[in-house]
Amino acid sequence: MAAKPGELMGICSSYQAVMPHFVCLADEFPQPVRPAKLPKGRGRLRRPRQSRFKTQPVTFDEIQEVEEEGVSPMEEEKAKKSFLQSLECLRRSTQSLSLQREQLSSCKLRNSLDSSDSDSAL
């Protein structure tokens, strides 16, 4: 007997119910529950759209004032010294890491050569 098209998809066409062998899929992948929508007018109050776009105008003179304030030469020198010190520290740490990597790779190479020599001695 040929199966009905609805039964091929896992639905009993006479009852419109999920067939038992497809029930496990419903348990594994439950459908997400959507939150109930609030009726219009009872949601949170929104600010008027115009208030979001209001900003204080900035003039060219104000921008120049900020640039002119600047940092004292002593603070600038201190910051530069700190920056160069951190660069040097970073360089040393990367250099030591590369040396460790080279030592590790040479050690692995030496061990692999030693093991091949011992095999040939047998």
Swiss-Prot record:
Coiled coil: none annotated. The keyword Phosphoprotein applies. It comes from the Eukaryota. Its main location: cytoplasm. It holds the Pfam family DUF4695. The modification Phosphothreonine is found at residue 55. Keywords: Cytoplasm, Phosphoprotein. The keyword Aminoacyl-tRNA synthetase does not apply. It is found in: Cytoplasm. InterPro entries: DUF4695. Disulfide bonds: none annotated. The modification Phosphoserine is found at residues 72, 86, 96, 112, 118. This is Uncharacterized protein C11orf96. It comes from Homo sapiens. The lineage of its organism: Eukaryota, Metazoa, Chordata, Craniata, Vertebrata. The gene is C11orf96.
